[in-house]
């Protein structure tokens, strides 16, 4: 099973996260299938690759709670509803 989850990057005290599609059995820093976004909690910046995220969600990938909250905050699911209608 594939999940969309955060992968920690950056330096000490300056965490930056990549949003990645990764197998559930892999550890947090393990090899990801694909990078689908970027999240910087310090600068409050988010960058999403919408087609890649849609692809993985259609294939059955489950976002973690934190990734789901980031996508919801970026109004991702409103865009998804617009593309489906």
Curated annotation (Swiss-Prot):
Its main location: plastid. GO terms for biological process: mitochondrial translation. It is found in: Plastid, Chloroplast. Keywords: Chloroplast, Plastid, Ribonucleoprotein, Ribosomal protein. GO terms for molecular function: structural constituent of ribosome. Pfam families: Ribosomal_S16. Transmembrane segments: none annotated. GO terms for cellular component: chloroplast; mitochondrion; small ribosomal subunit. InterPro entries: Ribosomal_bS16, Ribosomal_bS16_CS, Ribosomal_bS16_dom_sf. Belongs to the bacterial ribosomal protein bS16 family. This is Small ribosomal subunit protein bS16c. It comes from Hordeum vulgare (Barley).
